[in-house]
């Protein structure tokens, strides 16, 4: 058994143990490539004896020479990132403006090879730096952002445009520097396919909480009459709106509300001007399904009460422990019809998973 296969089996075994006692079907397992799967990567820039190189540090140890790991290549990162790494360091090394006090770098790439590089400094960035960075940007055919304390200099653009294939359709996504995106694009496509499969035949309208840049929203919109998606981050809402227009989708509306705020609006506890200004009347919707992709902390108690009211729940989780806690509550009203493990983060302990729940009929399981 290969190292990759073994670590994936270990994750599946962990889920089986964690969810023991709950009526969960066999876990569907979606593999990742074993290398070049990360579209994002971050490194410190280490300066030593006139040399400059990429570095990471041993987990749990203080950043410094004793815990230093030199990274001339990084197998987990996309091939585009690996190709660019030596070129970027070589070009930057030739310029004092680019080299001096360069502290860290962040790469954001796409499946097509588009590249955004954020160069982080411990100095004020001036016109001389901008001129040098523009020359580097042109030479390497990338987009560059310069960051320092209190400064963000965007030389061309602060985003990349990713294309993900779901079924027979390509979806374009604007992914903005510093905002959340799924780092493993290959597995992300599998997650989108799975979610669309879980939604097959559910019909009606869809409510989505924590929609981000519309990663799941866009393909799921093909499975429902209308979609109302909520997200609190202004940056993510802006990206989601661009993505909706770029993909010419006409049945999605975005509400800039947190999950907690939406719960208050849905239950009639509060009215929100943001909903009215967006032309959103909750009474117009006939929701059959709710889709949730919460942060690591899981779904809070009040929002969980809201979620439990829906006939169908599609729940994507980045933390199986909080998923288990939430399912202990949801299992009182729903049965788990499907369960999936997505290996979004190979060779780490992190597990991404998904479940489809359907409301029990007369207290009996549908399964």
Swiss-Prot record:
GO MF assignments: rRNA binding; tRNA (uracil(54)-C5)-methyltransferase activity, S-adenosyl methionine-dependent; tRNA binding
Keyword terms of this UniProt record: Methyltransferase, S-adenosyl-L-methionine, Transferase, tRNA processing
SUPFAM superfamilies, sorted: S-adenosyl-L-methionine-dependent methyltransferases
Pfam families cross-referenced by the UniProt entry: tRNA_U5-meth_tr
Catalytic activity: uridine(54) in tRNA + S-adenosyl-L-methionine = 5-methyluridine(54) in tRNA + S-adenosyl-L-homocysteine + H(+); uridine(341) in tmRNA + S-adenosyl-L-methionine = 5-methyluridine(341) in tmRNA + S-adenosyl-L-homocysteine + H(+)
UniProt keyword Methyltransferase present: yes
Gene Ontology CC: cytosol
Residues that, per the record, bind S-adenosyl-L-methionine: 182, 210, 215, 231, 293
InterPro entries: MeTrfase_TrmA_AS, SAM-dependent_MTases_sf, TrmA_MeTrfase, U5_MeTrfase_fam
Entry EC number(s): 2.1.1.-, 2.1.1.35
Active-site residues per Swiss-Prot or TrEMBL entry: 318, 352
Any single biological process term in GO: tRNA methylation
Residue stretches spanning the membrane: none
Cited PROSITE patterns: SAM_MT_RNA_M5U, TRMA_1
Listed HAMAP family: RNA_methyltr_TrmA
Function description: Dual-specificity methyltransferase that catalyzes the formation of 5-methyluridine at position 54 (m5U54) in all tRNAs, and that of position 341 (m5U341) in tmRNA (transfer-mRNA).
Family: Belongs to the class I-like SAM-binding methyltransferase superfamily. RNA M5U methyltransferase family. TrmA subfamily.
Name the record gives this protein: tRNA/tmRNA (uracil-C(5))-methyltransferase
Species name: Neisseria meningitidis serogroup C / serotype 2a (strain ATCC 700532 / DSM 15464 / FAM18)
